[in-house]
Amino acid sequence: LGKDVTDKFLAGLPGIQKEGCDGLITSARFILHRLPAHGRTVCLEFFGSAREATPAIVEIKDYCDAHPDVLLAGLEHLDARYLKAVGYATKSPRATRPNMVLLIDIVSDDETAVGVAASKIVQLANARGGEGFIAVSAETRKKFWLDRARTAAIAAHTNAFKINEDVVIPLPRLGDYTDGIERINIELSIANKLKLCDALAGFFAAPLPLLEDDDTVADPAQVAEKQAQAQALVAAVRERWANYLANLDAPFAPPSPASGGGAGGEGRDTVARASWGGAGGEGAVPLTVFAALRDKQVRVSWKRELRRELHQLFVGREYTRILEACDRLHGEILKSRVFVALHMHAGDGNVHTNIPVNSDDYAMLQTANAAVARIMKLATDLGGVISGEHGIGLTKLEFLDDATLASFAEYKKKVDPHGRFNKGKLMR
């Protein structure tokens, strides 16, 4: 593990940890290393699933580690949520943002070698469905790194802060980790949309707000009919989405072309034809509901499945207040949606897992804390550790097992028998 600082082990180097339990620094000596004469910054954009793209991290690191003349100076990762938050401008001519970006710095005293290595890195990305762009000048290289410097933008939509917990994952398991985080995100997203359905069901069960004046008078019978149709729509969509959430590991059967459902999961037909009992017929490639949602073969969409249908149902000036109220409900509930965003110091497997939260929303904070617990378990289940560059502090203490804490307590007795170094820290 690249940045595992458990028991002072940092890639084999003895070290101190962030909690301030190891001693008092009275002096320090800094060693400056000469920067190699030539460098390249490579930006890699991946538009497929993160699971398929993530092995490129290991392949690029292995290639650079084995190169006799080129050093890997930086390897950073941003996921789709970060790219959206920073307003990432896609370098590829494609019309969509990538699902994953890698930013790589390589350096060498041999200009030819560093240029060839940059091209080889792009080829490695191409083999994983990625596209690559190479910056040579100092100005262009700096521009490539600007998006990485704006990662705090992930919390811009909340009024408070982000929970930022780091873990260390074995590089070969990064794909499994990103899949695990995506599953958490899908569950949180669907749960938030079910909350919206419940709010809409309550709204349509009550008298509806109508715009009535000298120019507009709503027909009571027509209003009652539309109200019943809206209630049925919300109930059907809620049932469909709840089925997804309850059956993420079940086989998913996409609709046949004859059924009229789109491959992208648009419209109600695609979702309604999801099969929980089989893999879609003889010869079909098994696909789980989770994988279909992750790869956007099917979507859970407020805009397409509810909002668009409601706008088609409530056509007319007299119904504008109804549609405005639905949009307000959506906006209010969306503010409380919890999601997890990732960026990594990918070269050493140090993953920063960020969850933006509103400090005045207790339920949101509880949901975020539950997500953190799942993330810590995911990391350790994959052979990783929770003691990365952020250390343990206070928030991770509950996730350390008794044996680990007992080992630290024994160490502390030896180096600090009088408890002068941050007394009581990391002690239960």
For the regions a protein language model found, what residue spans apply to each?
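Noncatalytic alpha-helical scaffold of FAD-dependent oxidoreductases
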Residues: 1-259, 264-428
